[in-house]
Amino acid sequence: MIMMQFACPLLKRAFFLSALSLLAGTTLVHAQADSLDDHKLTEVYTPVPPVVTPAAKFGEAPSDAVILFNGRNLDEWVKVSDGSPADWIVSKDILTVNKTSGNIQTKRSFTNYQLHLEYRIPANITGSDQARGNSGLFLASTGKGDDGYELQILDNYNNPTYTNGQVGSIYKQSIPLANPCRKPGEWQTYDVAWVAPVFNTDGSLASPAKVTVFLNGVLVQNSYELKGQTRYRGKPYYKAHGPSPIKLQAHGDKSEPISFRNIWVRPS
């Protein structure tokens, strides 16, 4: 073996320091690799999600849901106009719009939630365009009348209209991704995930509302960011508000009134 000869002790010392540094670096790399390979470093145990008992049948309310319409009464609802008890028609587990009474909304207010609702356009529906089975699900009611954010309800089974006003649209804002409308006389379902807008202390918008909507099990709105509250004329805009009721619309068209059942919400 050939031994390396050093010209001076200083060079010899520098060589050994360099070798020691290289050894330390190699050890550190191996230590880091070992840490990355430790699966426990990426495991999280808290918080623990709450246990929710799912419904026996799809569409029925899970154990933590707030039942908004139980098929028997309107204890969870009031008139939008004056806050008096809602007087839409309840019969045989079905809620039917009373067009002479006006819109109704929940007594409770909500922020973010999951909502399930079923509706039916009458089999004998008449009219056309927007005057055929028109109603609306307001995801947050922010005042009287039609103030708020409207998810359109309309008969669009062989009934053309403007596309940002058909069923599944965020009215006058977002065209639905598909038209899975069933025939009049058949029950239809809305499943909604709503994220309310957030406002700064000065009333300015911090983050917009977002909504994901399934109509009859088909995705029609995919995490859509709303531009503001619904407006029939003009551009939508935001106005600061807090937790809000959910509203159902009694539309003024002359077609036969629509019906609802199985309405529940899971606040999140």
Annotate the PLM regions:
Residues 14-26:
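Bacterial N-terminal signal peptides
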Residues 4, 28-29:
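Serine/threonine-rich, low-complexity intrinsically disordered segments
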Residues 1-10:
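N-terminal secretory signal peptides that target proteins for export/translocation
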Residues 31-268:
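Carbohydrate-interacting regions of secretory-pathway proteins
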